[in-house]
Amino acid sequence: MMSAARTVTVGTATAAPGTIVRGAIPVTTLAGGTPLEIPVVVINGARGGPCFWVDGAIHGDEPEGPLACQIAMREIDPAQLAGTVVLVPVMNVPAFEAAQRGNPLDTFSYDMNRIYPGRANGYLTERMAAAHAEAMVANADFEISIHSGGAHSFLDKAIFVDESPASVELATAMGPGWGCIMSSFNPKGSPMAHMKDSGKVGITVELGGRSATSPTEFARVGRELANSILNILRHYTMYPGAAAYPSPRYKGQQEALLAAASGLFLPAPGVGFLTMMTKGDAIARITNIFGDTLAELVAPADGMIFGLRALPNVTTGEWCCFFCKVEGTRD
C-alpha cells in the first residue's frame, strides 16, 4: 500500500504535499557578511512514496547538473508525483561561482568529491559537505550525482556504481544509451559512497563537458539528463508513464590514459565514444608542432572510450582519455 503523503523539510524549504518549494541548506557566513548556503528545490508529491535526491555541480566547472535540475523542476508536476524529488542544482557554490573544479576559498579540502561527507567542524568545504550530507541522509532513499568532463574534457554517458543490486538497478533506470556501467573507482569521499555507508543507494553519472557547451550541445546534454531524472521516477512508479532501459548494459572498470609526450593531441579518424574497441586499436596520437608523431594512445583492453580531452595542446603526464575496460555484459 502506498504511504500517505507528508510534509518534507530540507534546510529552509518546507513543502506540503502537492507543492514545489525553493530554499537552501545553511552553512555559514563569509568574511564579507554574505551567507553561504546550498540551494535546494523540494518537489513534494500529492501522494506518498520514496525520496529521490539529485545533486549537481559538486565540481563547479560542471554546469550540466544545474541545467538538468532546471528542466526537471519545470516539468515534474507534484500533483502527479508519488513521493518526493529533492533537487540540489549546485552543491559547491563557491566553486560554481568561480567556474572551477573545487572551492577557491579553501586550500586544504578543495575537491568536495574527495572529502565528502566532510566534518561539521572541519575546513570550509568539509563544513559544506557535512551540512549537505546531514540533509541528504535524513531524507533521501536514493541519489544521483551529476558530473561531466568540466573544463578539460567531454564525457559521454557513463555511470559508476558500487555493484550492489540496488545501485545497478538505479543505473539501469537512467534509460537508453546509459549502458556503460562501471564499478566505482572512488569507494570513499563521494555522495554515492556516503549513501552506501548510510544503508541507502547512490550512483555517479557522467555526461557533458567543455566540447559540449555550445548553445545547442549544452541544451541537448541538459535535456538528456532531465530525461533520465524522469525515467528514474517512472522506473520506481513515482510518476506516470513507462520507463525505458539501456541495452546492452556493460560491466567494466575505468582506466585513465595519460600523455606520453607533449604537443598536439589528435584523435584517430573515426574514433568514437561508447563504441566497442579491441585491445591495441588506435585512439589518438601526439605530434610535435611540426607534425611528427611522438606518441600513440591505443586501447589498453577490449572496451570503449567514454571520455576524451577537449584541448588539443597537451603536456607529458596530462590526462587524455577515460577508457572503460569491458568485462562483459549485465544482461
Please report, for each region that a protein language model flagged, where it lies by residue.
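Structured catalytic-domain cores with a bias toward divalent-metal coordination
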Residues: 1-331
